[in-house]
Every structure is written in structure tokens, then in C-alpha cells.
Amino acid sequence: MKRILYIVIGISLTACLTEVDLSDLRESPRLVVNGVAVAGEPLRLSVTRTWFYTDDHPNVVIPDATVRLYVNDHYEETIPFVPGDTLFNAAGSYQAAFVPKMADRLRLEVSAPGYEAIHAETVIPQASQLLEAKAVREVSTADSTVKRVVYSISFQDAVEEENYYLFRLEEGNLINEVDSMYSWRVLYLDYAEEPLFVQSTSALDQILFSQYLSGYDGRVFSDETINGKSYTIRLQTSTHYVSEATKRLRVRLYAISADYYRYLKTLQDQSDRSFANHLIDAGLAEPIRVYSNIDGGLGIFGGCAPNRMEVDYE
């Protein structure tokens, strides 16, 4: 009887197997362009192609693409491919002689043999206006063993414009007083303490998950609630030990294009601890689709104007 039972179980398990032909899901490869035009820096771009997830990570760099750059509706140059690229950690990248400036409107037209031609546009925004940066060491009123550093960064938002920003704080430890050399690290902060970063989260997330918002490499925000006003961002770090040595605070406030903001925002939303992501992890919701402004392809072509301020604190 037991032998018959094993046979029946084996037959039933075999019947549950279904072969899926993944080749039916394969699409024709498309061009992928990734690059951020930074005011004051030569334009650099990565041109690759899409690949199927069973392809075992092939080399997808496209070295023979034709990349034409237009600036303010005028042809500027055909950007050459330069082999070997430590910045992108790739076989090479497209490096232009052109250096964009604020308010420039850029357009890319990219084509390559065997692929559909694509194009993308972006605008370099005006740089942010940093007003003041401060860092103050404090002792917690609730627990005297807990020390913290409170950071206050003030800036002015442009009037009657939709503005988008990427904010990041770095801390430097003095390692060579003679040459004023610092060892820098990005500050790991909880952005949930600052209303400006909470504005883009849902009401449900603010109730359930307001205790933490990540952003090790910085966090993006818009001027939706502060349009045309001066504003002070307040954040803090808490620990049982805060070094008394003199440190340097570096504030980075990048003004970024709307498309670049939407792209970074989707990446940010993917990493946040949110109700939507819990549903996605449980298979109850569609994954967050990464934003792209490449017409006919994938990737991002963004614009950025950097600004920074450094202050010492003790």
C-alpha cells in the first residue's frame, strides 16, 4: 500500500511541472543612454543596449554609435567614443569637448547599426543659492549619555519656478593640518526628521513608517511647499560618542532637471521602507518602474548645476 502511495505522489508531482519558453518573452535589444550634463564639466555619456536576464551579463557597451549633440537648437558636435573608462567602470564612454553652462538646452540624437534611433533632451538648471550652514554639538535632554550633532542648512529657492534638488552632507576629519587635508565621509542621516523630505511620502507611510527615511548618498526633493522662499533644513545624528576634534561640514545642494529628479525619485522610492514596497515584496503590487526620458530607448539624460559650502565646527 505504501509503495502505491509513493507512485501516486510521484506522478502527481510530475504533473505539476510546466516548462516555460523564455525565448517568447525576449524583445529586440534597444539602445540605453545614461548621462548627466553638469554645468562647468565636459559632457560624458554611456551608450549600451538592453539584454535579456538569462544572457549571463554580456558586454553591452556600444562603441560604434553616432551621438550627435545639439545645444539651444544648434548642432554642436558628434561625440566620439573613448575606449577605457575608469569613471563608468566600462569598456569606454562618449566624451564631448563641449562644456555645458546653466540654462543650456541640450538634445541628443543617438543611432547605431541594428538599433532603432533614439533621442533625449534636458536643460541645465540655475545653481542653488546656499545661504548658511551650521553644525552644533549637543547633549540629549532625555539621556545625558547620548550626544548629537544638529545640522542647519539655509538656502533660497527661486521665485515662481519649479525647482528640484539633490541634497547631501559630508563630514571631513583633518588628517594633515599643514596641507589642510581632510578625510571625507558621507553622513548617514534619518531624513524623516525634516518635513521637506517627508512631503513626497504618502499619508499612510507617514503613519506606519515615519521613523526612518534613508538616503546615504543624499536625497532629492522639490520646492512644492517652499516655492520662492528661504528655508532651513534641519537634521541630526545621535550617538553615545561624538569626537571633540575640529571637523569640517560640506554641504552639497545640486539643482537638477525635472527629468533627472523623477529618475532619482523612482530609485529613492524603490529603496524606501514603504507600504507600497511591502506590497511589492509580497507580490501584491506591481514593481516601481524606473523613470526614463530616452525617447525610443531607455536610460536617463539629466541636467545638473552643483553648489557646495564648507564650514568648520568644534
Residue spans for each PLM region:
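Sec-dependent bacterial lipoprotein signal peptides
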Residues: M1-T14
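A sequence/structural signal for flexible, mid-protein segments enriched
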Residues: L17-E314
